[in-house]
Amino acid sequence: MSKLPGEDTLLEVNIDDIRVSPFQPRRIFFEEDLKELILSIKAVGLIHPPVVREIRNGDKVLYYELIAGERRWRALQSAGYKTIPVVLKQVLADDLAAEATLIENIQRVNLNPLEMAEAFRRLIVVFGLTQDKVAKKVGKKRSTVANYLRLFSLSNEIQEKINSGELTLGHAKVILSLEDESLRQILSEKIISSKLAVREAEIEAKRLLKGKEDASKKEASLQKTSCLVSYQERLATTFGYPVTVKPQGKRICVSFFVEGEEALESLEKALTAGSFEVTV
């Protein structure tokens, strides 16, 4: 059967002659998922064969590099299949093959959030695409691409929980709403231990944030009170009279307590003459 130049070809190849593309974004494959896929393939056949390209040395084919379908290939390989049907892409340049691998997997494969983020990052870093161009190529909103890329600002520990499936993308977005790293860690642990839904995680995030704000206000109040007490003690030492220093709105009220007009007159002279020094 003849084919046109550049036309894709369906052929059967040795399963061990296939290699994974270095640009494959997916890194985690769960054994249970592969077993389910094998059962499906045995029941209805391989409906969508993996897509590959030839890697050659002159006229000799060294191996076939996967562009899409690694999960299907791994499933059949683990099931002991010796050959596999594939769709051969004709003469695809390295850069185009790499870009096609990333885009194909983003569009068709159930990547976890961090694998998706890594695919977006590679399109940006390796191929110099903007977030807008990436969004157009993969059929997503620019804000979606940006949200995925924000996952890299999370701690390694939280990223591992996303990779393992303990935290979803929705959970990650809630965690990212907290700027404080310690609060992020507390929230992530709470989500996992209490099996919180995203909405419940949002409520918990607000509670944690309010608690931190209340604690900050209390700390500021304590610091202010400590400062005023210090002034109060120094003023009492300087003038020799009992003193209170209290906040009144944005102002500070300083009250001296003196006994008799003579003491009051003495205090007045000291204040108006400016002949005093408050030791700091």
UniProtKB/Swiss-Prot annotation:
One Pfam family per UniProt: HTH_ParB
Signal sequence, renumbered to the chain: none
Identification of the protein by name: Probable chromosome-partitioning protein ParB
Organism for this UniProt entry: Chlamydia muridarum (strain MoPn / Nigg)
Gene behind the chain: parB
Function of the protein: Involved in chromosome partition. Localize to both poles of the predivisional cell following completion of DNA replication. Binds to the DNA origin of replication.
Keywords: Chromosome partition, DNA-binding
Superkingdom, taxonomy of origin: Bacteria
Cellular compartments per GO CC: chromosome
GO BP field: chromosome segregation; positive regulation of sporulation resulting in formation of a cellular spore
